[in-house]
């Protein structure tokens, strides 16, 4: 059986890892074993953070919608409830964009949501005169 010499493949593998680790501090950019460990962790972090990013954007959209809805005298919760009752199917990304860039369209949606909501059940009731 022929002898296998790994010099070329091993050097290429190490070079790729060290190139990915360029820019890291200290030994993590110069020593193969440290660099390999850090590159592996970095790939895991980037994978996880790509998923976290979606939740972060949703939080941002909700904050923007809430601020714009409160400016119109309505909370985020009641606004979304009113839109659902009115049958308006606009996602939070578009609502946040409207709140920032097209205030008149957003205000029209607020009025639609207000009209669709039932009377406030927690409001004090008028006393019936007996």
UniProtKB/Swiss-Prot annotation:
One of its GO terms (molecular function) is structural constituent of ribosome. The keyword Repeat does not apply. It comes from the Bacteria. Pfam families: Ribosomal_L20 (PF00453). One of its GO terms (biological process) is ribosomal large subunit assembly. Keywords: Ribonucleoprotein, Ribosomal protein, RNA-binding, rRNA-binding. Signal peptide: none annotated. Binds directly to 23S ribosomal RNA and is necessary for the in vitro assembly process of the 50S ribosomal subunit. It is not involved in the protein synthesizing functions of that subunit. Belongs to the bacterial ribosomal protein bL20 family. This is Large ribosomal subunit protein bL20.
């Amino acid at each position: 059986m022929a002898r296998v010499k790994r010099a070329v493949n091993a050097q290429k593998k190490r070079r790729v890892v060290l190139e990915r680790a360029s820019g890291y501090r200290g030994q993590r950019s110069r020593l193969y074993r440290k660099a390999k460990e850090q590159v592996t962790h970095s790939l895991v972090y980037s994978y996880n953070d790509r998923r976290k990013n979606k939740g972060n954007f949703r939080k941002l959209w909700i904050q923007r919608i809430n601020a714009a809805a409160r400016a119109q005298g309505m909370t985020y919760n009641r606004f979304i409830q009113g839109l659902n009752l009115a049958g308006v199917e606009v996602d939070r990304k578009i609502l946040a964009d409207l709140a920032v860039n097209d205030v008149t369209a957003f205000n029209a949606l607020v009025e639609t949501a207000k009209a669709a909501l039932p009377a406030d059940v927690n409001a004090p009731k008028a006393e019936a005169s007996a």
